[in-house]
Amino acid sequence: METIKYLIIDTETTGLDASKHEMLAFGAVVVVDGRIVETLELKIKPARIENADKKALEVNGYTERAWRDAVTKRDAAEILKYFLITHRDATSVGHNLQFDIKFIKAFSAEQNVELRVPWPYIDTRDLCRAVLAPFGLQSMSLDSICEFLGWKRKNAHTALSDCEDCAKLIINLCPPSPRFLLRLKAMQLLRNMGSLL
C-alpha cells in the first residue's frame, strides 16, 4: 500500500501584503498515514517591523520579548530550504494556502534561496466547504470550523497550532472516516432539533 504523506504549513505575518509585509513565523506538521511524525516551528526576526500592521501583530501575539530568541532571516531560509527539500514528496496542505505560499515566495526572493512548497496542494478551506458545509458550516475560518466541530483551539493564530488544527482536519476529512461522518450527522440532527424547539 502506498504511503500518504501531507506537509501542513502555516505562516504568521506582519500584514496581508507579501510585497511589503514580512513572515514572522513558519509552522509545519508532517502527517504520514494519518499520524503526525514531525513538527517545525520557527519564529523569524523581522527586519522592517515599522511597516507592520498593528492588528496583525496583535493577532499573532508579536512582542519584542516573545521574539527575542527568534532566528535570523538567513538562518530561517536555510532551515526552510532543508525542511522543504526533505519533504518534497508530500502533498502540501494549508488553510488559505495561497496566502502562505505568497509569503514564502516573497521570503525566498528576499533571501535569494530557492524555497519550493511541494505540489500538489490541498486547501482545507475548500475541503471544509465540500465536506462540512452540507452539514451546516457557514464560515470557513479555521476558528469557525474548529468551533463547529467542537474542537478547542490552543494558541490560535500561532503557526504551529494552526498547522496542528489543519492536521486534524486532513486526518479526519481526507477521506472522511465513517465514524467522523456519523458524528457530523448526529451534530446536524441535534442542531436541527434545537431550531425546532
Segments predicted by a language model, with ranges:
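Conserved non-catalytic scaffold segment of RNase H-like nuclease domains
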Residues: 1-7, 12-105, 144-151, 157, ...
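Short, glycine/acidic-enriched loop or turn micro-motifs at the edges of active sites
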Residues: 13-15, 126, 165
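Conserved protein kinase catalytic core
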Residues: 16-18, 129, 168
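Substrate-recognition/cap helix-loop segment adjacent to the acidic, metal-dependent catalytic center
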Residues: 98-120
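Conserved glycosyltransferase catalytic-site signature
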Residues: 101, 124, 160-163
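Short alpha-helix plus adjacent loop in nuclease-associated cores
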Residues: 121-137
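A structural motif
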Residues: 135-145
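Acidic two-metal-ion nuclease catalytic site recognized across multiple nuclease folds
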Residues: 147-148, 160, 164-197
